[in-house]
Amino acid sequence: KCLCITDDKPVFTFPTIASNCSACTAVSIMYNEDGTFLKPNFFVRPAMHAFIDTEIIAKAPCRYMWAGMGDTYAKFYEATISSRDERLEHFTAVGVAISHMCRDPLLAYGAKGFADHQKGISSYEVEQIILAIIVTTGVASIFLTKDFTPDYNSGLAHAIFYALTSYPIIEEKHLHGEVVGFGVLLALLVDGQDEEFEKVYQLNKSVKLPVSLEEIEISEQQWEESTNRIPHMSDVAHYPYAITKQMLTDAMRKLKERAGRENHE
């Protein structure tokens, strides 16, 4: 996609899994040879067409749609936080409005859809999740990145993910959306959105997306190291407030407290 669109050649995509929105976006995420994050590479247009067969995707390994759910609801939270209290260009405002459909279907159909996907069934709920992951998130991204910047298309959850790619275990054993979904929990705690945090926490628990460092195999020491890098990631360069190490430390403490309350209930 990156090579062809840059060279003005037509590209058609045929996603066979629903792990992210890359089939419909006008951006490619570039990595260094060692697997660490390099940069987003933006294009003037997306692929010419994306051919989506939900029957094929419903029978694909479940972990891909599972991870895609985390990357998808992140779009809503990051777009709305990054654009807060700003007078937006029309195309950016359209992207923010569309991003609501990146969250709502997952909260409504996530648990049932994932259960059906585990059975290989292309149910209504599965289709809604697939379309949210691949199409809605991709379309939102096109509008949010029309000025070729990630200002409104990323945020703290992605900053957390990209900072954690410094540890080989993330790229070797975990998926992008899986870790981003965990990052959303911390981002919501940092932002003081307790009600939204609880919604996402319950969704993550229902489909077994991570709610702890242990589930993504990151040690306390590695997290402590990451809190020094995260505030300087490009994903939070455009944010309504500066991210600090203390904010991240406090958010992790609150997340652990929430998990602890559940363990004692």
Residue ranges and their predicted role:
Residues Y73-Y77, V126-A140, V184, N204, ...:
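Short alpha-helical scaffolding segments that buttress acidic/His motifs in well-ordered protein cores
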Residues P61, T80-R87, F143-T145, V190-E196, ...:
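Short helix-capping/linker segments at secondary-structure and domain boundaries
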Residues C2-P10, L189-G192:
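Alpha-helix C-terminal capping segments
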Residues I5-S99:
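A glycine/threonine-rich phosphate-anchoring loop and its flanking beta-alpha core
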Residues F76, T80-R84, T136, Y167, ...:
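A short secondary-structure junction motif
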Residues Q193-E265:
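C-terminal charged capping/lid subdomain of soluble metabolic enzymes
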Residues E89-Q202:
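Active-site segments that bind and position negatively charged phosphate/pyrophosphate groups
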